[in-house]
Amino acid sequence: MTRRKSKRLALPALAVMIAAAVAVPAFAQTAPRSTTLRAVGEVTFKANRYVKDSLRFNRDTVTIRKGGTLTISDITKQPHSFSLVKKGQIPRTMRQMENCFGKGPCDDLAVAHGAINPDTGEEQDPTTPLVNVGPAGFNQPGDSVLIPPSGKVKVKITGSSDKYYLCAIHPWMLGKVKVGR
C-alpha cells in the first residue's frame, strides 16, 4: 500500500473515531432514579492492645437524579445518621473530625434530632428521627435522618446541586451526593 493511499484510508477512520467520541456522551446514561448507600464495617477491641473502628459508608460518592430516592441501610448493627452539611464542614483531619462535636455540626444535628437536651447539654434518646430544615426533601445542610441499627431509611434528593453528607454520630463516615439529570 502506498503512503498516499494509507493517508486516504486513515482520514475517514479518524473522522469516524472523532464522531463516535462526540456521540457517545450524548447517549450517555442519565443518573439513576434510585440507589442505595450502606453503612458497613465493624468495631473491634483487644484488651490492652487496640480499638479498631472501620465503620464507613460503602461509597465515597453517590450519583442520583434530582428527585430520586436514596436508600440508606445499615449492616453494622450501630445507629447512624445521614446528615447534609456544608462542604467546609466535612472533616479532612483528625482535629476537624473531633471538632464536629461541641460547637460543630455534629452537636447541632444531635440537638435538632433531640439527642441532646439544649438546656442541659445532656444526651438522651432522640425524639426527632427526621430533620428537614427547608423545603420538603433532602436539599440543604441541616437535613438529616437517623438510621436505626440494622435498619434502613429512604430519602428523596430534591436539590439540584451536589450535596455533602456525614454521619453525625461517626463523622469519619462521610461523602458526596452527586446530583445528575
Region locations from a protein language model:
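N-terminal secretory signal peptides that target proteins for export/translocation
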Residues: 1-7
